[in-house]
């Protein structure tokens, strides 16, 4: 399922993704907050305490020579809400109990419309890898390969003005 793009009154944009997960909310919470589980699906290594509001965070790229960037935990309500600054973006993860597991909603507030298709495809791919990890199976594609598959869908859905910024650095040839 493709993500959605909304324009906010603040002049920013919000990417929204919803996934139904066949796992208890507590298991999904672990995947969102425990460093060893984040490594399986989150695009950077997170250094810092995700469970403490106000805590500083550092996001380090692995396998790519790119500078790290900073963030800060904004809100934590285990096991249903995690929100933090991710560089200039605000990432908000919400979990809700649902029949057969839980529902994950990821919202990424971005300040530049031209990033929407790129970032939308990126989060789509990361969430695919997260689902596979939760299911205990290997993802059929890496997040980068999955990004290549779904990027055009996001350009088509969000429009060319949402695709003025190219692929992530690690996918450039």
Where are these regions (language model features)?
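Glycine-centered loop/turn positions within well-structured domains
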Residues: 26, 80, 102
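Short beta-edge strand/loop motif at the mouth of beta-sheet-based domains
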Residues: 16-17, 35-70, 79-81, 142-151
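Short, ordered beta-strand-loop transition motifs
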Residues: 6-12, 50-53, 75-77, 96-99
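A conserved amphipathic terminal alpha-helix motif
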Residues: 110-171
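Glycine-centered tight beta-turn/hairpin loop motif at sheet-sheet or coil-to-beta transitions
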Residues: 12, 64-66, 88-90
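Charge-dense, helix-prone N-terminal extensions
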Residues: 4, 57-59, 66-68, 99, ...
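Hydrophobic ligand-binding cavity/cleft-lining segments
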Residues: 1-45, 170-173
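Beta-strand/loop substructures that line and gate deep hydrophobic ligand-binding cavities in soluble
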Residues: 74, 83-134
